[in-house]
């Protein structure tokens, strides 16, 4: 299944707020009832499916990519669900988003693909690059790169930067301090349900 490129409002209307996908929010009219769930008994499968979809759309992954991360998480030590979230949060495109250098994860992915981003002074154009503690994230010293990032920072750096990251606004430089803690993953998600959804596929 390919990466979703359709209307983003349609997705958040069904799944709720997904800040990685879009910074838009829905204002529901008074008395609004979600027709997809009203007066219906929701199956356990559907509940797990929707949690999985939240994760996939928030981080902008294909089905194959998400399944790959689940398999990696299952082989690692610790809680599979927590390891899965940590793997996704430490992706370069997500780190750029969490630093406020892009309004959304798709926007961050575009910055990486267009070679605006440096990791430890080396150009990295792979959005799925796994960031590690002590990685230093900067931008290329060229006017186009500078203007894009500065515009994004002025517009979108409103939320608090999580404690596993540090950002120097004057130098436009980010630092990965550590692997993210679960409490700093602000997406409303039950990762256990995602793991259960994939239990027969891994």
Swiss-Prot record:
PROSITE patterns: RIBOSOMAL_S4, S4. Coiled coil: none annotated. GO terms for molecular function: rRNA binding; structural constituent of ribosome. GO terms for biological process: translation. It holds the Pfam family S4. It is found in: Plastid, Chloroplast. Keywords: Chloroplast, Plastid, Ribonucleoprotein, Ribosomal protein, RNA-binding, rRNA-binding. Residues 90-154 form the S4 RNA-binding domain. It comes from the Eukaryota. The keyword Transport does not apply. NCBIfam families: PRK05327.1, rpsD_bact. Belongs to the universal ribosomal protein uS4 family. One of the primary rRNA binding proteins, it binds directly to 16S rRNA where it nucleates assembly of the body of the 30S subunit. With S5 and S12 plays an important role in translational accuracy. This is Small ribosomal subunit protein uS4c. It comes from Marchantia polymorpha.
């Amino acid at each position: 299944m390919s990466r979703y490129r359709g209307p983003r409002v349609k997705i958040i209307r069904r799944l709720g707020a997904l800040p990685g996908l879009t910074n838009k929010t829905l204002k529901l009219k008074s008395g609004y009832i979600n027709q997809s769930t009203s007066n219906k008994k929701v199956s356990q499968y559907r509940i797990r499916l929707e949690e999985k979809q939240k994760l996939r759309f928030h981080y902008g992954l294909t089905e194959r990519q998400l399944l790959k991360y689940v398999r990696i998480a299952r082989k690692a030590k610790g809680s599979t669900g927590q390891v899965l979230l940590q793997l996704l949060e430490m992706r370069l495109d997500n780190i750029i988003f969490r630093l406020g250098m892009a309004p959304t994860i798709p926007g961050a992915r575009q910055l990486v693909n267009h070679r605006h981003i440096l990791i430890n002074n080396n150009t990295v154009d792979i959005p799925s690059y796994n960031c590690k503690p002590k990685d230093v994230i900067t931008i290329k010293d060229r006017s186009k790169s500078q203007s894009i990032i500065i515009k994004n920072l002025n517009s979108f750096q409103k939320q608090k930067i999580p404690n596993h990251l540090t950002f120097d606004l004057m130098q436009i430089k980010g630092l990965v301090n550590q692997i993210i803690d679960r409490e700093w993953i602000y997406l409303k998600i039950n990762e256990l349900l995602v793991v259960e959804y994939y239990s027969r596929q891994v």
